[in-house]
Amino acid sequence: MINNRVVITGIGVVAPNALGAADFEVALKEGRSGIRFFETSQSLNFRCQIAGKPLITEDYKARFFDDYYQNKLDNNAIIYACLAGFEAWENAGLTHHQDQIDFDSGMIIGSGALGLDGSNHAVFSKILAGNNKRLGSRAIPESMSSGAAAYLNKILGLGNRILSNSSACITGTESVLLGYEHLKLGKAKRMLCGSTEGDGIFIWGAFDAMRILTSDSNEDPTNGSRPMCNSSVGFVPGSGSGAMVLETLESAKSRGAKIYAEILGADVNSGGLRDGGSMTAPNSNAVVHCMKNSLREAKVNSDEIDLISGHLTGTKGDATEIKNWKKALGGAQDKFPLINTPKSMIGHCIAGAGSIELVATLIQMEKSFVHGNYNIKEVNPDITAEIPLERIPMKTVHKEINTVIKANFGFGDLNCAIVLRKWKDG
């Protein structure tokens, strides 16, 4: 049976606090926030009037869209995915040709509420105004869940599997898992994997109605997202995209590619909406099962983990997540790995979260640092009852990071975990 080793050779990102991987590195180190106040949310009487949204400049967009005739796109989720995906492809040292198809390469770009983002511009507003005939040919492509992958592939011309997954907040990590499995089986040489999430009142309003967003920081946006903090009252919605080029080790070595990390193992599962699991809450037994299975496949012991990239949204679920990590990893309390999340800077980017956070993880591994968990005034005591305070860095720590486990958990009782090891020629 074919069992290829799989590595990551390219990264790209569009985040609320940075455009591109180089800028994202700086933002992570300095704790730069991309969370802002939105007057539209205030005018609609949203309880949460802040969000993390990428600031795409026309110059930044023009470098990509003017060359590839995508400048008329209205859907932000698609725009973010195209920018992040193309950056990752170039970062991997790969090229594309207008008149050729690359059957050795494929793509998995997941999305969440992509239709709610684009449909506002492309469909709803024109239909309600009686302008159905003016919808144009982009209405459906910009609204369909596979729109991001389709528009990006229009440029790259990849001929292997082209897939768009949608699994709530695990979408990004799951896209990488799916690409990893495809490459392990020898069905492709390269897979561009990632996810994207759009923004705007339709997406934000739906979460606001659930009363799971923060409502105490409309006048202080940058301090609104506070994962693991005792005073946190909900998460801040975010948007953006992360993308990575996954490649078989054989392919990467044959072309002398830079390798960021190797994927050692991964797992995805469901709690079945049983035993405490629901549409909005996880089944802790399933979460622990997922974490353990990813480590088992990776053949990694818990004491080898240097960093946990957690889900940690800034809700009451943070303490439960820490308990689950503790149960899955076992070991002495003082041996618990460092743990962080970039959500204090960018908010919870929903379907885009896993991929953006994986890019953040790869940057930290490459540059040997751990970014801080910013905005914490006092750590939730239910968390410090489980792990030592010093395992939760509040500012950037410069440290060699060799092995990381990254996990996300999503509505519908879904879980996904991935184990990565920094590449050191071997």
Residue ranges and their predicted role:
Residues 1-70, 250-262, 359-374, 416-426:
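ACP-dependent fatty acid/polyketide chain-elongation machinery
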Residues 5-9, 26, 32-37, 220-298, ...:
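Condensing-enzyme catalytic core mediating Claisen C-C bond formation in acyl metabolism
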Residues 8, 23, 29-166, 196-204, ...:
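Conserved beta-ketoacyl condensing-enzyme motif
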Residues 15-18, 65-86, 134-144, 162-177, ...:
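Active-site pocket-shaping loop/turn-to-helix segments
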Residues 81-94, 145-148, 153-156, 162-196, ...:
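Active-site-proximal alpha-helical scaffold in enzymes
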Residues 88-103, 252-259, 290-307, 329-333:
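Phosphate/pyrophosphate-binding loops at sites that engage ATP/ADP/AMP, CoA/4′-phosphopantetheine
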Residues 127-136, 177, 181, 185, ...:
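Glycine-/small-residue-rich "gating" segment that lines the acyl/pantetheine channel
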Residues 187-233, 268-281, 310-319, 335-389:
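Acyl-CoA/ACP chain-elongation machinery
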